[in-house]
Amino acid sequence: MAQEVFQRTKPHVNIGTIGHVDHGKTTLTAAITMTLAVNSTCTPKKYDEIDAAPEERARGITINTAHVEYETASRHYAHVDCPGHADYIKNMITGAAQMDGAILVVSAADGPMPQTKEHILLAKQVGVPSIVVFLNKEDQVDDEEILQLVDLEVRESLINYEFPGDKVPVVAGSALMALQALTEKPNTLRGENKWVDKIYELMDAVDSYIPTPKRDIEKPFLMPIEDVFSIQGRGTVATGRIERGILKLGDIVELIGLNEKIRSTVVTGLEMFRRLLEQGFAGENIGVLLRGIEKKDIERGMVIAQPGTIEPHTRFEAQVYILRKEEGGRHSPFFAGYRPQFFVRTADVTGVIEAFEYDNGDKTRMVMPGDRVKMIVNLICPIAIEKKMRFAIREGGRTIGAGVVLQILDSTQLKSKNK
């Protein structure tokens, strides 16, 4: 059967459900797809279809994630739901499904729980820009005051982790009651059932409060170099996939990483699948011919970027998940001073792990497989890194961890330019 062509008629937003185990994340995901299926071509998903999540691999780590899609009147959404708590942590740190926004599900009967707060913190660390709250299980709460207390408590938790808790939309409802109504009458329309209406109200809040993300094409140009070769009589060609932005013939670009010099050069040729291009766009695999650059000046792991938009650094703080033995990770702990390989974009660089600490600020000398820690890393040579970047940690050919850069620590702007 021929594959259907994806018609992009509405802005696309990636979203996910976060929150404590058993507060109703997967039930809500099912209720949203069934509610919105009435007005769109997207397929409704039952709870057990979402809960039997397929395995994904991101940066060498297996993650159980379920992806569903749905549409509102104004947007197309891709929604990720992870059944297990560990899967959430791995998904958010590896960026297997990067979220433009999240729906935080909190049981109105229980209020915020430890995992609720952990997910809010993690959302902040990995750069989820906006959160909308769904107070689930409203049908189990008889007292309006309890609902108001939980609302207040959730807002305080969000403020504690630097989200604008006083402005965040909070919608109370019952995913299970909505799901039951939709199971009995699949084409329930707005205004026909109070619980289904709450799902519409939630999606109205998501539509209006979570901003449409800036598309990669609008960002400054950057391409990690995958391979380099010489064309006799023409010069040096670097190949790779454009991560963001647009590259045009005649553009001035910088070569950054693996040494302290930032070289400046001009793009004299662009090609894709052996066809000449006037310009290359984010997501495309291209070859770039660079003026006055010899093969020895450029290698895999460097990036080609719009001048002044990214710099080489060696030292950074990161949030890292260390794989358990069962996930193919280490069998034993490691200590400060450990020197694994860091895979950042196409670069593969040795780094020294100088220090660790847990989210509560407790320092530790030893990290166990399965831990999630902050660490300070010092690479042996500078590479183009920036906040929110993802990376893998490897040792002896296997992935032992995955991380996201929280902040750059070295202040040395390695800008001895050689133009």
Curated annotation (Swiss-Prot):
<dbReference type="GO" id="GO:0005739">
    <property type="term" value="C:mitochondrion"/>
</dbReference>
<dbReference type="Pfam" id="PF03143">
    <property type="entry name" value="GTP_EFTU_D3"/>
</dbReference>
<dbReference type="InterPro" id="IPR033720">
    <property type="entry name" value="EFTU_2"/>
</dbReference>
<dbReference type="InterPro" id="IPR031157">
    <property type="entry name" value="G_TR_CS"/>
</dbReference>
<dbReference type="GO" id="GO:0009507">
    <property type="term" value="C:chloroplast"/>
</dbReference>
<dbReference type="Pfam" id="PF00009">
    <property type="entry name" value="GTP_EFTU"/>
</dbReference>
<comment type="function">
    <text>GTP hydrolase that promotes the GTP-dependent binding of aminoacyl-tRNA to the A-site of ribosomes during protein biosynthesis.</text>
</comment>
<dbReference type="InterPro" id="IPR027417">
    <property type="entry name" value="P-loop_NTPase"/>
</dbReference>
<feature type="binding site">
    <location>
        <begin position="19"/>
        <end position="26"/>
    </location>
    <ligand>
        <name>GTP</name>
    </ligand>
</feature>
<keyword id="KW-0378">Hydrolase</keyword>
<comment type="similarity">
    <text>Belongs to the TRAFAC class translation factor GTPase superfamily. Classic translation factor GTPase family. EF-Tu/EF-1A subfamily.</text>
</comment>
<dbReference type="InterPro" id="IPR041709">
    <property type="entry name" value="EF-Tu_GTP-bd"/>
</dbReference>
<keyword id="KW-0648">Protein biosynthesis</keyword>
<dbReference type="GO" id="GO:0005525">
    <property type="term" value="F:GTP binding"/>
</dbReference>
<keyword id="KW-0934">Plastid</keyword>
<protein>
    <recommendedName>
        <fullName>Elongation factor Tu, chloroplastic</fullName>
        <ecNumber>3.6.5.3</ecNumber>
    </recommendedName>
</protein>
<keyword id="KW-0460">Magnesium</keyword>
<feature type="region of interest" description="G5">
    <location>
        <begin position="174"/>
        <end position="176"/>
    </location>
</feature>
<dbReference type="InterPro" id="IPR000795">
    <property type="entry name" value="T_Tr_GTP-bd_dom"/>
</dbReference>
<dbReference type="InterPro" id="IPR004161">
    <property type="entry name" value="EFTu-like_2"/>
</dbReference>
<dbReference type="InterPro" id="IPR009001">
    <property type="entry name" value="Transl_elong_EF1A/Init_IF2_C"/>
</dbReference>
<dbReference type="GO" id="GO:0003924">
    <property type="term" value="F:GTPase activity"/>
</dbReference>
<dbReference type="GO" id="GO:0003746">
    <property type="term" value="F:translation elongation factor activity"/>
</dbReference>
<feature type="binding site">
    <location>
        <position position="26"/>
    </location>
    <ligand>
        <name>Mg(2+)</name>
    </ligand>
</feature>
<dbReference type="InterPro" id="IPR004541">
    <property type="entry name" value="Transl_elong_EFTu/EF1A_bac/org"/>
</dbReference>
<feature type="domain" description="tr-type G">
    <location>
        <begin position="10"/>
        <end position="214"/>
    </location>
</feature>
<keyword id="KW-0150">Chloroplast</keyword>
<feature type="region of interest" description="G4">
    <location>
        <begin position="136"/>
        <end position="139"/>
    </location>
</feature>
<dbReference type="InterPro" id="IPR004160">
    <property type="entry name" value="Transl_elong_EFTu/EF1A_C"/>
</dbReference>
<feature type="binding site">
    <location>
        <begin position="81"/>
        <end position="85"/>
    </location>
    <ligand>
        <name>GTP</name>
    </ligand>
</feature>
<dbReference type="InterPro" id="IPR009000">
    <property type="entry name" value="Transl_B-barrel_sf"/>
</dbReference>
<feature type="region of interest" description="G1">
    <location>
        <begin position="19"/>
        <end position="26"/>
    </location>
</feature>
<feature type="region of interest" description="G2">
    <location>
        <begin position="60"/>
        <end position="64"/>
    </location>
</feature>
<dbReference type="InterPro" id="IPR050055">
    <property type="entry name" value="EF-Tu_GTPase"/>
</dbReference>
<keyword id="KW-0547">Nucleotide-binding</keyword>
<dbReference type="Pfam" id="PF03144">
    <property type="entry name" value="GTP_EFTU_D2"/>
</dbReference>
<feature type="region of interest" description="G3">
    <location>
        <begin position="81"/>
        <end position="84"/>
    </location>
</feature>
<keyword id="KW-0342">GTP-binding</keyword>
<keyword id="KW-0479">Metal-binding</keyword>
<feature type="binding site">
    <location>
        <begin position="136"/>
        <end position="139"/>
    </location>
    <ligand>
        <name>GTP</name>
    </ligand>
</feature>
<dbReference type="InterPro" id="IPR005225">
    <property type="entry name" value="Small_GTP-bd"/>
</dbReference>
<keyword id="KW-0251">Elongation factor</keyword>
